[in-house]
Swiss-Prot record:
Belongs to the bacterial ribosomal protein bL12 family. It comes from Listeria monocytogenes serotype 4b (strain CLIP80459). The gene is rplL. This is Large ribosomal subunit protein bL12. InterPro entries: Ribosomal_bL12, Ribosomal_bL12_C, Ribosomal_bL12_C/ClpS-like, Ribosomal_bL12_oligo, Ribosomal_bL12_oligo_N_sf. One of its GO terms (cellular component) is cytosolic large ribosomal subunit. It holds the Pfam family Ribosomal_L12. Forms part of the ribosomal stalk which helps the ribosome interact with GTP-bound translation factors. Is thus essential for accurate translation. The lineage of its organism: Bacteria, Bacillati, Bacillota, Bacilli, Bacillales. Coiled coil: none annotated. HAMAP family: Ribosomal_bL12. GO terms for biological process: translation. PANTHER family: 39S RIBOSOMAL PROTEIN L12, LARGE RIBOSOMAL SUBUNIT PROTEIN BL12M. Keywords: Ribonucleoprotein, Ribosomal protein. GO terms for molecular function: mRNA binding; structural constituent of ribosome.
Length: 120
């Protein structure tokens, strides 16, 4: 049986949407394939982009809560009440979008007075 491509294309052009849908389903079943568009897989980059902005998060105040509140006030510029609320409601973000060096300095200051700090 010789295939005439032009006749097949002409038949497809004349078919209704329902007939074409049935044709696709029949082809999928007959050949075990799917008509779904392939999903593009993101190419893995050589190295992950280096993070440039960090968030300093107070995990807990530790044993010396008053000292931690003082350092939080110094770092954030918050008033006493706001700094106390922040420390009481830990874990909370202290500073967001800071450079790595500044984040490490803040972490060191807080850990020096007994706080548990995470840099994300």
């Amino acid at each position: 049986m010789a295939l005439n491509i032009e006749e097949i294309i002409a038949s497809v052009k004349e078919a209704s949407v329902l007939e074409l849908n049935d044709l696709v389903k029949a082809i999928e079943e007959e050949f075990g394939v799917t008509a779904a568009a392939p999903v593009a897989v993101a190419a893995a980059g050589g190295a992950a982009a280096e993070q440039t902005e960090f968030t300093v998060e107070l995990a807990s105040a530790g044993d010396s809560k008053i000292k931690v509140i003082k350092v939080v006030r110094e770092i954030t510029g918050l008033g006493l009440k706001e700094a106390k609320e922040l420390v009481d409601n830990a874990p909370k973000a202290l500073k967001e979008g800071v450079a790595k060096e500044e984040a490490e300095e803040i972490k060191a200051k807080l850990e020096e007075v007994g706080a548990n700090v995470e840099v994300k």
